[in-house]
Every structure is written in structure tokens, then in C-alpha cells.
UniProtKB/Swiss-Prot annotation:
This is Chorismate synthase. Its cofactor is FMNH2. Gene3D superfamilies: Chorismate synthase AroC. The lineage of its organism: Bacteria, Bacillati, Bacillota, Bacilli, Lactobacillales. Pathway: Metabolic intermediate biosynthesis; chorismate biosynthesis; chorismate from D-erythrose 4-phosphate and phosphoenolpyruvate: step 7/7. Belongs to the chorismate synthase family. The keyword Lyase applies.
Amino acid sequence: MRYLTAGESHGPRLTAIIEGIPAGLPLTAEDINEDLRRRQGGYGRGGRMKIENDQVVFTSGVRHGKTTGAPITMDVINKDHQKWLDIMSAEDIEDRLKSKRKITHPRPGHADLVGGIKYRFDDLRNSLERSSARETTMRVAVGAVAKRLLAELDMEIANHVVVFGGKEIDVPENLTVAEIKQRAAQSEVSIVNQEREQEIKDYIDQIKRDGDTIGGVVETVVGGVPVGLGSYVQWDRKLDARLAQAVVSINAFKGVEFGLGFEAGYRKGSQVMDEILWSKEDGYTRRTNNLGGFEGGMTNGQPIVVRGVMKPIPTLYKPLMSVDIETHEPYKATVERSDPTALPAAGMVMEAVVATVLAQEILEKFSSDNLEELKEAVAKHRDYTKNY
């Protein structure tokens, strides 16, 4: 399974193409749109979310509510494009129109300046448009397809925010994936501890009044994972490594950890390793899950627990100093639309990329052209694992 996304933030549409999804997977536009709505939601979102009402359109690969095995093509229309017809025109336009929204003031923390140097642009809008987090719309769409596949294999996935700008959220112990998903969905800030809800919302309001932004930490949990996804035989086949790349590829994400993560560096080995248990009913399990569901780069059957660190959104309404690329004079950076935080939305993106990588691994290990054969192969593997 592989995929590509295309499109610009203010272009006419966003597109994704997925190849390798087995035939026979039940799939509707609403399966995708539900996750797109969640990506646009969350307390603290800004004006762009009021303009766009993202709806996916299938143009190939799905017929009568099921995948055909052919490449799946999905489009999402950018409604805001109508205000940018000249600026984002694919055809050449007059110089006076080109300069209308030309960007020469790179924003600190964005791809603007480095992209301009790399691709030799004199208008940094070219960098801004593709590097925008608007691209994650299609990664959420791809992830929604992957999640439908995982659900058919009795795997479940959820995300929630565990840190808001330095404010840690207390997470009740032993919550199931379903409970995490339910609690986070009921929260405007995607947390599982409802007692902290108003405190976090008040904090976001204050950050907005200050013209500033905050980052934080998002956790994704996956249950029902088969043993043995990934491999130790080569460095690039380790599943936790692939997941780490996927998470850090999300806009503004700067770090990733599994299970205890960096805390493991402060503990003794006896306090970190997960003791192995066995019972006739459950087969092999672990006493704890400090390693986040991985041993040797492979899934061990415990829930996958992965966290991503998101830096504060770099676009500030109190812009930082920058330098004009034409005059080299100091200048306050260009201000585009921004939000005080996008952590709840970022959680949806993280959930999507994790689901996508897991679907890729499933299809690599249990290669099948149709859903029926795939389900049979996974069920057979689960039986073997239990009786090993």
C-alpha cells in the first residue's frame, strides 16, 4: 500500500491517491468526512475552519460502497480558492497581479525562507502553499481509509491530548482504547479527564488574547494489534521506526516516544522491561506495557502507545522579526491565519498517519488482493500466536 497527496492551501482542490487497498472493503464518503470534521474541530480553531466544510469525493477505486482493488482517488474542494483565482492561477498572469499577494517576508519557524532558497523562488508563497498544514486534510482522508481496514481486522485506535502548553493532563489508569476514544470525542480539547476541561479552555482563551500560541503532546493508542508486525532483520523494517518517521512528518511535530519513552532513560532495567505472562485463555501477555507495544522493532501484542510532541504554531498575531528577501531589511514577519493551538486537530492527523503505517504493515505481512482472504490470513495468524 502506498499513497501520494497533492494540492496547495489556497489551490482549487486537494487530492490523494492510494494504491494497494484490497477489494471488498466497505467504504463510503461519510467514513472519510467524519474524520475530516474532527480534524477541523477542537477548541481554539480559527477562521479557515469556518470557511471550509471538507467533503471528500471519490473519483476512482470505490464502487457501490466497496473498494474495487484499483487505485483510490479522493478529492477535497478548497472553497477559499474562489478568493485566490488570480494569485493561484496555473496560467501566467500580469506582473501587477503577481505582486498583489507576493510574500517576501519569511515567517520564523515556517518553511518559507528555506523553501525559497532550495527551489529558488522570489515569491515565498510557493513555499507557504504546499508546506501548509492544509495538506494534512488528505493524510486524514488516507488514514480514514486505513482505519476502515484496521476495523475489519478487529483493531481499534484513539487519540487524546496529554499536555497543553506545559499543563499535563492526568489520565486515569487502565482505560480501554474505546473509553479513550469516547472520552476524547466528548471533549472540545480532546482530553480524557473532564475535570480539566474548563481550565484548558480558559488557558487557550488567554493565549489567544496574548496573540501567542502553544504546543503540547498528543498520544495515540492502538488495540488489537497482531504480534509480529515489523521486523528486526533490517533497521528500516522496524515498525516503531516507521511510525516515528510518520509522526515527525506531521507539520510542527518535533519529537516522538513509545510507552515510557524518554522516562525509560531515568529508570533501571528492572523497572522498564515488561515481564512475559501466559495463560490458556489469552496466550502470551505482558505484566506491564512500558515499551509501548514493541520489542525488537516488532509489535508484541500489547497496545501500541505512541506520543508526538507538537511545537507551538509558528504563525503569531504578534509577529516576530524577520528579514525581507529583496531588501534584506529587518521586517515583521507576514501574518497568515493562525490558531492559538491546533492540538485536537493534530491528534486526528497523528491518529491517521499511525493507522496508515499499520495498514501498510498489515498488507505487507498478510498480502491479499481482497478483504476476505486478508481476514482469513490475520485470523489464522492470531490462532497460531495464541497456541505457540
